[in-house]
Design a protein with these regions (language model features):
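An amphipathic, basic-hydrophobic alpha-helix
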Residues: 61-87, 97-102, 130-134, 138
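Active-site proximal beta-strand in glycosyltransferases
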Residues: 3, 87, 102-124, 147
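Nucleotide-sugar donor phosphate/pyrophosphate-binding loop at the beta->alpha transition
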Residues: 108-115, 121-141, 155
């Protein structure tokens, strides 16, 4: 398979899990494309079928904050089309799952699938911000597959967002 993985590249659980998963998938023969604003810190040595695609964010005087989510969606489109990805696996609902949803709607490859892995604060803290609630719910429901790293997180997601979609548990 050709798999695009998006994660936060910084120190922390979700970035570690995503990077180690990508490395294992590459060792097993899959082609893995990391799409992020910086190289994941755990991606320290060369593995033949791992590629990195940097998301550039531009600043524009009219807007106070850079458009990371939109820049990410654009880069996901570019990589998905050029590399003919089968799957975008995103770690974190906000903003990664929203960006993946946009990319999936834009690309010409209608077979592209999106899997979202929920890690914790994207659901229990950030996602509970009232302005993000509808986005989190929508991005989860629009994903082709959803995983959570614990039963607790799965239950929180189902009750906080009234999700009807199946959420698989893959402990980290």
């Amino acid at each position: 398979m050709k798999i695009g993985i998006t994660c936060y590249p910084t120190y922390g659980g979700s970035g570690v899990i995503a990077t180690e998963l990508g490395k294992e998938l590459a060792i097993r023969g899959h082609e893995v494309h990391f799409i992020s604003y910086a190289l994941p810190f755990r991606l320290t040595k060369y593995i033949e079928n791992i590629f990195f695609h940097e998301v550039d964010t531009t600043s524009y005087p009219l807007f106070e904050f850079p458009f990371y989510a939109l820049s990410l969606a654009s880069k996901m489109c570019e990589v998905a089309e050029f590399e003919k990805l089968d799957l975008l696996h995103v770690h974190y609902a906000i903003p990664h799952a929203i960006s993946a949803y946009l990319a999936k709607q834009i690309v010409k490859n209608k077979k592209l699938k999106v899997t979202t892995t929920l890690h914790g604060t994207d659901i229990t803290l950030v996602g509970l911000e009232p302005s993000f609630l509808p986005l989190v719910k929508f991005s989860i429901e629009q994903s082709d597959g959803v995983t959570a790293v614990s039963r607790f997180l799965k239950e929180k997601t189902l009750t906080n967002y009234y999700i009807e979609k199946e959420i698989d548990i893959i402990p980290n």
